[in-house]
Structures are given as structure tokens and as C-alpha cells.
């Protein structure tokens, strides 16, 4: 039996009910072929409560598979590590993930990691930063301008296109300045 285990990014560690999900289907972790942690919990841990933890929008494998559902910066670049929380399909996925976990009898509560937008510096799991970014550049690069985010921002009276143009201008000014 394997003694050392390396987690598989973007997978779930329980048997998902695929019917709960929409276009984003959870990826089942291969460790489930050997051991179902959630199913076997009551058998081995009779007096211990189980608190589940799940990652919501920080999911590079899902982002690679669904780049149209990712956060986009002011330049239109997708952040494949961050599914856009304003997208209806992403919201459906997160709700289904929580519902699926909550349906497991041994689960007492669920802790959600990254239920929303990520800061730019959190980023990809193996990012390299060759250009030192000041706080303002990092904050501006973290803003999402996906079609879904812009549509929802506009519905709240935000001038999303003007804001996006301003952000692009500020970032271009930063990158052209040579101050980094």
C-alpha cells in the first residue's frame, strides 16, 4: 500500500453525485479507488466529528477545461487558476459541490476556501514573477473584467467599460515606467 501521497489538484475526495452538477463536473480523485474517506469515517472514527473542507473557485484543472468561465483581467487575459464567481455555471458548481458534501451523513460542517475572486498574488500554483509589482499593480491585476462580472457590475451602476479602460491605462503606465 502506498505510504506517500501527493494530492491531485482540482479533484474531490468523495464520490460525487454527477447529476447535481451542470457543465462543470467535479473530478474524482484516484485515491477513491483504494479508500473512501467519507464513507468509512464512522467506522474508524466513531467519536470524532467530521468537518469537510473544499476549494471553490481556485481550480486550475477546471479553468484549463473551461477557460470561458475564468476570471479575466483588464487586458482580457484569462486566469485559468480562478473560475469567475460572477458566472452562473460557476455558481451552480459551487452550490452543487456544497450540496454534495452536505449530503454525506458524517459531514458536520463545510469550510469553503476561495468562494470568490482571488488576489492576484495568490495566483497559479507554480507562478513565476519576473516583474516586481507594486501594491497598486497587484490590486489592478486582480480585478475581473469577464463578461459576467462586467454585466453584473453594470446592473449595479458601475461603468465597467470606463473602469476597464482606466485600469488598462494605469497598468500600461506602470509597465512603461521602468520603476519596477
Predicted features and spans:
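Aromatic-lined carbohydrate-binding/catalytic grooves of carbohydrate-active enzymes
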Residues: 1-33
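Catalytic domains of carbohydrate-active enzymes, especially glycoside hydrolases
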Residues: 1-9, 100-109
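Extended, charge-rich helix/loop segments that form flexible
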Residues: 137-180
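Glycine-rich, aromatic-flanked loop segments that form ligand/cofactor-binding clefts
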Residues: 2-5, 33-75, 109-118, 155, ...
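Well-ordered, non-membrane alpha-helical segments in soluble/globular domains
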Residues: 28-40, 91-95, 180
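Outer-membrane beta-barrel and related beta-rich outer-membrane complex signature
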Residues: 122-124
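Short metal-coordination and nucleic-acid-contact micro-motifs, chiefly zinc-binding Cys/His arrays
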Residues: 127
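Active-site-adjacent "subsite" loops/lids of carbohydrate-active enzymes
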Residues: 55-105, 130-132, 139-151
Amino acid at each position: 500500500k502506498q505510504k506517500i501521497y501527493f494530492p491531485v489538484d482540482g479533484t474531490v475526495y468523495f464520490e460525487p453525485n454527477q447529476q447535481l452538477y451542470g457543465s462543470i463536473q467535479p473530478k474524482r480523485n484516484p485515491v477513491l479507488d483504494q479508500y473512501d474517506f467519507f464513507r468509512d469515517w464512522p467506522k474508524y472514527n466513531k467519536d470524532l466529528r467530521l468537518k469537510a473542507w473544499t476549494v471553490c473557485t481556485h481550480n486550475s484543472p477546471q479553468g484549463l477545461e473551461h477557460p470561458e468561465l475564468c476570471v479575466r483581467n483588464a487586458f482580457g487575459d484569462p486566469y485559468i487558476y480562478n473560475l469567475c464567481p460572477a458566472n452562473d455555471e460557476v455558481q451552480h458548481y459551487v452550490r452543487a459541490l456544497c450540496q454534495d458534501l452536505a449530503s454525506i451523513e458524517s459531514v458536520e460542517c463545510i469550510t469553503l476556501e476561495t468562494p470568490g475572486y482571488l488576489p492576484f498574488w495568490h495566483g497559479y500554483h507554480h507562478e513565476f514573477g519576473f516583474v516586481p509589482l507594486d501594491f497598486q499593480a497587484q490590486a489592478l491585476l486582480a480585478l475581473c473584467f469577464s463578461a459576467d462580472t462586467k454585466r453584473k457590475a453594470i446592473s449595479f451602476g458601475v461603468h465597467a467599460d470606463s473602469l476597464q479602460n482606466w485600469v488598462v491605462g494605469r497598468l500600461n503606465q506602470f509597465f512603461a515606467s521602468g520603476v519596477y
